[in-house]
């Protein structure tokens, strides 16, 4: 009986510790390839933030997963404020070249402003 109780408590503690360590992010994105009717995987997306002089500074760069998603832009941490003007650049031309297709858009820029700490999702 003591072993079962100890095992149960150990599992509960471990579960709480692991869930407390799970990071959260303020920004995510998703790309659907409407020509194929499926997610666009392995597409590079760069995240820029505009400074007070109007210049764009790259702050992150990732590739979409097999579901066409990036879930982890702008990690939420205590005392971190992500307010500001941002730009996501979706590098679509290499994706279409890999599929032997022409692309009208070599890249797609999406500009947006974060004014609070809510989660935002930018799909294209």
Q: Model features per residue range: what roles?
A:
Residues 44-48, 87-89:
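Beta-strand signatures of extracellular beta-sandwich domains
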Residues 1-4:
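Positively charged n-region of N-terminal signal peptides that target proteins for export
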Residues 71-84:
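Short Pro-Gly-centered beta-turn/loop motif in secreted/extracellular proteins
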Residues 53-73:
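Short, acidic Ser/Thr/Gly-rich low-complexity loop/linker segments typical of extracellular
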Residues 83-124:
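Feature of secretome-associated and extracellular-like proteins
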């Amino acid at each position: 009986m003591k072993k079962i109780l100890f095992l149960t408590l150990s599992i509960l503690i471990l579960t709480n510790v692991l869930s407390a360590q799970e990071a959260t992010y303020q920004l995510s994105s998703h790309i659907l390839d409407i020509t194929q009717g499926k997610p666009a995987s392995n597409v590079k997306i760069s995240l820029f933030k505009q400074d007070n002089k109007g210049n764009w500074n790259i702050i992150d760069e990732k590739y979409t997963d097999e579901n066409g998603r990036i879930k982890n832009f702008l990690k939420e941490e205590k005392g971190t404020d992500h307010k500001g003007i941002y730009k996501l650049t979706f590098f679509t031309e290499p994706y279409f070249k890999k599929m032997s297709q022409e692309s009208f858009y070599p890249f797609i820029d999406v500009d947006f402003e974060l004014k609070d700490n809510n989660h935002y999702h930018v799909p294209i």
